[in-house]
Amino acid sequence: MVMSDPIADLLTRIRNANVVRHEVVEVPSSNIKKAIANIMLTEGYIRNLEEYRDGSVDMLRITMKYGQNKERIITGLKRISKPGLRVYCRKDETPKVLNGLGVAVVSTSKGIVTDREARKLGVGGEVLCYIW
C-alpha cells in the first residue's frame, strides 16, 4: 500500500499509542521518520528508538515515555505542512510552539532540525509538525 503522507502516519501511530498508553510503537522506517523520531528522543518525548529489519522492510521501534502513574509526556502532535498544502517559514519567521515549551520540526537545507536549531543556524524551511 502506498502512503500519501508517511509523516502523518508516524504522528498518528505515536498519538494513538500515547492515548492507550502502549509501551512500544513500530512504524516503517524512512530517513525523514528517523530524523523526526531522533528529535523526539533528544527533546525527551520518547524513551528509546531502535531500527531493525523485518523481512525486507526496515522498521523503527519507538519506546514511549510516560511519567509516574503513567501520565503522558506527549500532550499533542500536529502535522503542519501537508502534501496538499505546504507550509514554509523564513529564518525570521520560525514558529514557537507554546511560547517555547513545545517543538516545531523544520526541514531545512541543513537537515531536519528543531525550531530552536533553525533559529541558531539562521535558516528557514518547511514546517513539518509541532510536538508539545
From Swiss-Prot:
GO terms for biological process: translation. Pfam families: Ribosomal_S8 (PF00410). GO terms for cellular component: ribonucleoprotein complex; ribosome. The keyword Kinase does not apply. Keywords: Ribonucleoprotein, Ribosomal protein, RNA-binding, rRNA-binding. InterPro entries: Ribosomal_uS8, Ribosomal_uS8_CS, Ribosomal_uS8_sf. One of its GO terms (molecular function) is rRNA binding. HAMAP family: Ribosomal_uS8_B. One of the primary rRNA binding proteins, it binds directly to 16S rRNA central domain where it helps coordinate assembly of the platform of the 30S subunit. Belongs to the universal ribosomal protein uS8 family. Part of the 30S ribosomal subunit. Contacts proteins S5 and S12. NCBIfam families: PRK00136.1. This is Small ribosomal subunit protein uS8. The lineage of its organism: Bacteria, Bacillati, Bacillota, Clostridia, Eubacteriales.
